[in-house]
Amino acid sequence: MKEILQTIIENLVDDKASISINEIEGEKSIVFEVKVAEADMGKIIGKQGKIAQSIRSIMKAVSAKEHKRVSVEFLD
């Protein structure tokens, strides 16, 4: 799942080297903490958070196969 998130993020940002994704896995859930360059943060979040919400929706759909709850957090 991390690879899918990585691919999505890489296609949205200019500074691919600054991408950092931390995966915290629990018993029934996974939390992804995403950090990108400050200049790219707006591209990840989008107008009114629509891109961020779309990323979260895609990850929830992917996680349904593994029967785990996924949360994606975008950190400054």
Language-model segments: what does each one mean?
Residues 1-43, 53-76:
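RNA-contacting regions in translation and RNA-metabolism proteins
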Residues 50:
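Residue-level recognition of oxygen-bearing side chains
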